[in-house]
Structure formats: structure tokens, C-alpha cells
Amino acid sequence: MTLVTPLQFSTVQPNLYRGSYPREINLPFLRTLRLKYILSLTPEPLSTDPLMVKFCEENNIKTIHIKCQSERKADKTKPKIKRKKKTVPIEYDVVVRCVKFLIDKGHYPCYMHCTNGELIISLVVACMRKFSYWSTVSILNEFLVYNSSINIHERNFIENFNSEIEVDDLDIKDKVPWITVRYIARTATESKDELRVDDANASEKVARVSSVSNSLPKLKFHSM
């Protein structure tokens, strides 16, 4: 049997995959990934698709839906309605919700997708790369692998992502190793927050939050 990947399929990190909305021809391939979850960044959830519902039930795959607008081009045959045009198709809350879900190593293997595997997924992945200290050049180069160009609004969206994300009900030891090498935690002996940096090759480094670069996002764990 020939295995066909979804359009724009790629591995983001071990056991985390990205691509477009799965079609019937892609299901044998997705089955080989032994997925636990499918994360959909689409207008409608997979639960509205009988084919995908059956596939997920047969393979014990749970689905998560974060509603996003369609990436398809507007239908020029329809009458134009004057409204404020969004500069990018998602808000930062979509990225935050994705990070909160993907930080838990218990949610892997996971396939995340938008409608066509291009802009929305690329924006989310680009923002998440900042947790791994990717350079801006590397982030934008990866973005351009899946998109023919990047406009100023999309670039600003990526570069200005510096949210402090509250993480509840997850122990630090249960986070995936590739996301967040820098996190904020409240210590048991002090009332002030401290910034801690994970370093696999050295002892834990500690610095005050005031010294943190404002250009980087941070995670704040409450279960420590």
C-alpha cells in the first residue's frame, strides 16, 4: 500500500507533526504515526466530518479544536461586504492555547493542522520556536518553506509574540524538553518570581525577572 502524507506534512519536533486537513488518502499514513491527539486550527472541528470521526474512533485518537478563520481566498463572485480586514488570520490567544496543550508530553504523538497547512500553522510554529531560542532568521526561513512570502503584518506578529503564559495543573517534569528553556516559577522560600533557565549541560541558572528580555515569551508554572 502506498502511503500518502497530508499536504505540507513535516515533523516539527519528535512526535509532533504539522500539515493540512487530512483527506481519506492520508489516513493510512496517519495511522502509522500512532497518534494520541489531532489538534485542529480550522473553522469547524473534525467532529463534523464523519470520515475523520470514524478514523479517530478506530485508532483511539482524541481531537482538540481551536477555532480559526478559513485560510482560503475570498470568493470574488460574492458581493463585497465592507468590514475591517484582519492583518493576520489568528490572534495571540490561539498561539497561547496551542502552547498550553503542546507543552504536556502526555499529549504526544500529535498531528496539528489548519486547512491547507500553510499560514495559520506556520504562524503558530514560528511563535513556538521562540521558546527554543531560534533566531529570527531561522524562524522566518522555516516560515518561507511553507509560504511563498511573508508580509510585514505576519512578521510583526511573530516578532512581537512575548506573552507570559500561565500554566496550571502541569508539573515542570511533565513538560516536553524542547519547549521553553526559560520559565518563570514561584519558589517555596521566596515571595518573588524568579526566572529559571533549563540547561541540560549545566546546573540550573537563576536570574531575576527584571533581567529577562521582553522579546521572548515565558511560561509561569503554578504547580511547583
Swiss-Prot record:
It comes from the Eukaryota. Keywords: Cytoplasm, Hydrolase, Phosphoprotein, Protein phosphatase. Its EC number is 3.1.3.48. Its main location: cytoplasm. The active site is at residue 114. Residues 8-170 form the Tyrosine-protein phosphatase domain. It catalyses: O-phospho-L-tyrosyl-[protein] + H2O = L-tyrosyl-[protein] + phosphate. The gene is OCA6. This is Putative tyrosine-protein phosphatase OCA6. The lineage of its organism: Eukaryota, Fungi, Dikarya, Ascomycota, Saccharomycotina. Belongs to the protein-tyrosine phosphatase family. Required for replication of Brome mosaic virus (BMV). One of its GO terms (molecular function) is phosphatase activity. GO terms for cellular component: cytoplasm. The keyword Ribosomal protein does not apply. Disulfide bonds: none annotated. InterPro entries: Prot-tyrosine_phosphatase-like, Siw14-like, TYR_PHOSPHATASE_DUAL_dom. The modification Phosphothreonine is found at residue 2. Pfam families: Y_phosphatase2. It is found in: Cytoplasm.
